[in-house]
């Protein structure tokens, strides 16, 4: 037990931290400030919690998010009063939308110093609107055991709310009166006997995992539909292999193709799933193929994929749509005829029955998808193997084949995630992809990736120049970083994703206000933050630098590409590749 009896604020804060430790907290991110002094001391001095000081609140919050994404355990964040907590807001939004557990402790002035121009005091009650799972203001610390019992149980409840019913943010607003520093208040020593023998904390234990509620049988509608598809969307499962195996089991039972997003681990466990389809975005650009492959049933697992082609296709068709999702969220942006199964894919128990046995016969529907997917993949491989110049789209394709097994990779938003969707190859490397696809912003990209990589296996980040520039304060984490992160920087001097949109035809407005080139010398930026830097000259060099990955530190490998040339190449590739596939429409119609 680690309690600090120097004064009422240190005792109050140490009860918070000891309760969190017993619940399972291991990491706290501390931003500097005066009003939060008691909390900072309590976290920093606890022997079993790693407390990391980070200057910039926005970067600190995204770093905490990255840690929580990987561990799927709440990370605590602490800041002082005033605008400090407002800098956590983008992370709160992303955590809510991507279902990541976080605990926020914003220190505050007591009620008598609010709304009276006392300084560094804003209205922090419900600071984050409706985004937290739960939010509360704690009582003013006072030497009463009834209040300490209230504090313990409130922290336990907050921990639970960060997990259930869906993982997310819990916000504790924490008012403190003076003294903020650990100045001795002798009368507090009288409370020591109330905390002896560990009885105060004996009921504080880690949460028990959710009991699995099995689906006793598949919905009968599924067993009668021959032309079904399974969509494996964005997902960060706690056990990637178990998750991928569960999807494979369902797909094998139903003989359905599995259209798999690059931000799902399913593409990286290809040996588990013979029904894997990864080229659906390109396939659906061939309107004849898309028409002939119309499904009568869609089963969605995870969030909807990045692919706009897939969205448009299903929005037009309006098939019966089932979503497997344990949360209470509305996960259907298409507003289809949707039925929800509120459970996890791992919960399915597939019963043997005559109906299923009949379903297990070889499906011509599945075979058609597999043949087309294989042909398109062969075209992709032939095309990219012949590309000898530095091309943005080839980077994802190469990474999917050369990264060491089980490498965590953080893929930035905008073009990085889309190139992965187009070109990330199915493999058996068990690579674990991470992303910020809750709100899809580029803010906090570097900091989140550093959090993902903190005390983890050597990791990789794939990003464009603007996403990295937007979060360069993340490099201030470097002195406290433990682990390794290789940053593969695609520098095309601007927002390449806008080159794919109609606005790209409207110059000079486009270049100044949308592409927004920054003309930054990244080698000089790296010198400022003492980050090792290398400029990539050719493809063999990047492969050599990634096999194996270093064990510690941060480094940047810069791949300079031509934004205009990349966009022309990609537009041509996307429009022509599926059309080159030789597959007769009569065969599709028969299937």
Curated annotation (Swiss-Prot):
Gene Ontology biological process: menaquinone biosynthetic process; phylloquinone biosynthetic process
Keywords of the record: Magnesium, Manganese, Metal-binding, Thiamine pyrophosphate, Transferase
EC number: 2.2.1.9
InterPro entries per the UniProt record, alphabetical: MenaQ_synth_MenD, MenD_middle, THDP-binding, Thiamin_PyroP_enz_TPP-bd_dom
Cofactor: Mg(2+); Mn(2+); thiamine diphosphate
Regions annotated as coiled coil: none
Pfam family, one: TPP_enzyme_M_2
Cofactor remark from the record: Binds 1 thiamine pyrophosphate per subunit.
Record field: catalytic activity: isochorismate + 2-oxoglutarate + H(+) = 5-enolpyruvoyl-6-hydroxy-2-succinyl-cyclohex-3-ene-1-carboxylate + CO2
Pathway: Quinol/quinone metabolism; 1,4-dihydroxy-2-naphthoate biosynthesis; 1,4-dihydroxy-2-naphthoate from chorismate: step 2/7; Cofactor biosynthesis; phylloquinone biosynthesis
Stored CDD domains: TPP_PYR_MenD, TPP_SHCHC_synthase
Keyword DNA-binding included in the entry's annotation: no
Family of the protein in this entry: Belongs to the TPP enzyme family. MenD subfamily.
Protein role: Catalyzes the thiamine diphosphate-dependent decarboxylation of 2-oxoglutarate and the subsequent addition of the resulting succinic semialdehyde-thiamine pyrophosphate anion to isochorismate to yield 2-succinyl-5-enolpyruvyl-6-hydroxy-3-cyclohexene-1-carboxylate (SEPHCHC).
Name assigned to this protein: 2-succinyl-5-enolpyruvyl-6-hydroxy-3-cyclohexene-1-carboxylate synthase
Gene source species: Rippkaea orientalis (strain PCC 8801 / RF-1) (Cyanothece sp. (strain PCC 8801))
Organismal lineage: Bacteria, Bacillati, Cyanobacteriota, Cyanophyceae, Oscillatoriophycideae
